[in-house]
């Protein structure tokens, strides 16, 4: 493709509404343009990278035995009402009515539609297992769409759904897809981690997220330094700390005037944050609950919500805190509290700690569990922190990372098949419920995540497998007939051996061409100038490492081909 005949509207200035690196660079590189909040046009360069990801996904899905189909974006309300997600999904589900007043939604996901299809068509165990997938645009009405393709309202996604006769067979399907996902992100040239994760609104028994590692990632993840354990911080398990060996001291009231925060109280009392216990008031399905965590730890609301088995969990308002404890925010404590108390595992082994005193400007010292209060539940309800011991092995500790979720796999079990009555007849002619799994990859999000992970001050650094083009040829001067002829010959020869080439034939200054080449992130750049050409050589530069080498013109094609083939076959 010749640059002069292509559509690459690069810009020098960063748009003011762009916040994260990928959003800024995709706009500057002419890959996307905003149409409305969270809705983008994919321009030719951006679309080429998206199609590369799609192709890798399709190849690995097909390799894993999945079969492609395409389902409607518009879905009838009846299916969502059957699964009980019509109201549960919240305002992100864009609902509307047609001219006959029938209710519909724009699909953010397709569990209901695929289950309806399968329940109509699959009748016998002989038709199972079955794995169906699609690549399609989806819509979620995000309240604050931001970060370009990282959190848009409309996005391109691959979603797959497996159907099996038993839980054991479903585990096999899940493992196949898990391995397929690993291959997909490896082939995309990304650094990633597969981590244990919460199932969220999709539901099911267990799940894994695939996280592209990036400092700008929205998600905190942890991994063990010694074993394969990795998890989203929402899901990561905390191990029980050894108990403190100390004799309980007499409970003591201490005045703490205007000292509310952990930092203020611990500084005033001259103690570490690990010797204080925070009492956090929550409301679970309308009922107040007190959650206790150590002063240097944070409450994990997802763990607490699962533990309590509630539908809704939120932090209590100042009014509720004062009504329940008799004190303003900052002075709540478990001693004498008349509501359900849930204590983190860490507190079980603590002795003589500090808590709020349930009165203004008052705290308790030398509080001990069992003597001074008795929790209704003691469980893991905190976020793990860097350096915590691994919950799976004795040798390692947990390290913290930032990640961008690009894929998610779920074991759904019978959640949807039961509510939508998707069944089959087994070998004995008995009706059984189908076991399901679902598997999503954010196609457009993967491209943005790649840029978050691979960039520098000059622009994007695409891995070869998902770059819009493998190589760019830059003619130093388009007025030099020999230079142009050499570029033309290189372009034809590279294209003939399967290398995707962008020939920058514009009548622009070399510096301007090089800046654009760096900005749009083409992995390999061949520079053809009259001086080197007179010696039968061209310059080859790697966008990733910045290495520059002079090659004999006769070797350039095979050298570039070798680099591309090696990257595509990794």
From Swiss-Prot:
SUPFAM superfamilies: Class II aaRS ABD-related (SSF52954), Class II aaRS and biotin synthetases (SSF55681), YbaK/ProRS associated domain (SSF55826). Its EC number is 6.1.1.15. GO terms for molecular function: aminoacyl-tRNA deacylase activity; ATP binding; proline-tRNA ligase activity. Transmembrane segments: none annotated. GO terms for cellular component: cytosol. One of its GO terms (biological process) is prolyl-tRNA aminoacylation. PROSITE patterns: AA_TRNA_LIGASE_II (PS50862). It is found in: Cytoplasm. It holds the Pfam family HGTP_anticodon. Its main location: cytoplasm. It comes from the Bacteria. Keywords: Aminoacyl-tRNA synthetase, ATP-binding, Cytoplasm, Ligase, Nucleotide-binding, Protein biosynthesis. The keyword Lipid metabolism does not apply. It catalyses: tRNA(Pro) + L-proline + ATP = L-prolyl-tRNA(Pro) + AMP + diphosphate. Homodimer. Catalyzes the attachment of proline to tRNA(Pro) in a two-step reaction: proline is first activated by ATP to form Pro-AMP and then transferred to the acceptor end of tRNA(Pro). As ProRS can inadvertently accommodate and process non-cognate amino acids such as alanine and cysteine, to avoid such errors it has two additional distinct editing activities against alanine. One activity is designated as 'pretransfer' editing and involves the tRNA(Pro)-independent hydrolysis of activated Ala-AMP. Consists of three domains: the N-terminal catalytic domain, the editing domain and the C-terminal anticodon-binding domain. Belongs to the class-II aminoacyl-tRNA synthetase family. ProS type 1 subfamily. This is Proline--tRNA ligase.
């Amino acid at each position: 493709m010749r640059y002069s005949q292509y559509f690459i509207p690069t810009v020098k200035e960063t748009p003011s509404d762009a916040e994260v690196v990928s959003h800024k660079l995709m706009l500057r590189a002419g890959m996307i343009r905003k149409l409305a909040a969270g809705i983008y046009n994919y321009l030719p360069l951006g679309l080429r990278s998206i199609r590369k990801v799609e192709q890798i996904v399709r190849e690995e899905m097909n390799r894993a035995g999945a079969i492609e189909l395409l389902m409607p974006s518009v879905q009838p309300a009846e299916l969502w009402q059957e699964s009980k997600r019509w109201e549960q999904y919240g305002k992100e589900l864009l609902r509307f009515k047609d001219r006959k007043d029938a209710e519909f939604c724009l699909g953010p996901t397709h569990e209901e539609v695929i289950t309806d299809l399968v329940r109509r068509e699959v009748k016998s165990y002989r038709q199972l297992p079955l794995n169906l997938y699609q690549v399609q645009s989806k819509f979620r009405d995000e309240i604050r769409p931001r970060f370009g393709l990282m959190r848009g309202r409309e996005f391109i996604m691959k979603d797959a759904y497996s159907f099996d006769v038993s839980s054991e067979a479903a585990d096999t399907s899940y493992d196949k897809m898990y391995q397929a996902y690993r291959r997909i992100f490896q082939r995309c040239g990304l650094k990633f981690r597969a981590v244990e994760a919460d199932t969220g609104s999709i539901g099911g028994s267990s799940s894994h997220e695939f996280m592209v590692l990036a400092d700008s990632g929205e998600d905190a993840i942890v991994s063990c330094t010694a074993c394969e354990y990795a998890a989203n911080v929402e899901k990561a398990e905390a191990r029980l700390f050894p108990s403190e060996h100390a004799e309980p001291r007499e409970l003591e009231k201490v005045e703490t005037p205007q000292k509310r925060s952990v930092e203020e109280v611990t500084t005033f009392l001259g103690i570490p944050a690990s010797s204080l216990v925070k009492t956090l008031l929550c409301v679970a399905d309308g009922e107040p609950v007190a959650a206790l965590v150590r002063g240097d730890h944070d409450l994990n609301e997802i763990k607490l919500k699962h533990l309590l088995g509630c539908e809704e969990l939120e932090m209590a308002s100042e009014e509720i805190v004062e009504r329940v404890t008799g004190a303003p925010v900052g002075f709540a404590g478990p001693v004498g509290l008349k509501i359900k108390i849930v204590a983190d595992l860490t507190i079980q082994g603590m002795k003589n700690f500090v808590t709020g005193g349930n009165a203004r400007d008052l705290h308790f010292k030398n509080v001990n569990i069992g003597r001074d209060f008795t929790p209704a539940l003691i469980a893991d309800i905190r976020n793990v922190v860097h350096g915590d011991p691994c919950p799976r092995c004795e040798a390692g500790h947990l390290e913290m990372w930032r990640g961008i979720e690009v894929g998610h796999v779920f074991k759904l079990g019978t959640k949807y098949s039961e509510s939508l009555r998707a069944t089959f007849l087994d070998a004995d002619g008995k009706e059984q419920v189908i076991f399901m799994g679902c598997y999503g990859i954010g196609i457009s999000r993967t491209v943005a995540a790649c840029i978050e992970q691979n960039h520098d001050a000059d622009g994007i650094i695409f891995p070869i497998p998902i770059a819009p083009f493998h190589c760019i040829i830059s003619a130093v001067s388009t007025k030099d007939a020999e230079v142009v002829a050499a570029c033309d010959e290189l372009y034809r020869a590279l294209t003939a051996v399967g290398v995707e080439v962008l020939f920058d034939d514009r009548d622009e200054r070399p510096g301007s061409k090089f800046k654009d080449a760096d900005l749009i992130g083409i992995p390999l750049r061949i520079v053809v100038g009259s001086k080197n050409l007179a010696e039968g050589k061209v310059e080859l530069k790697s966008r990733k490492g910045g290495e520059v080498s002079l090659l004999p013109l006769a070797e350039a094609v095979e050298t570039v081909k070798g680099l591309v083939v090696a990257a595509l076959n990794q």
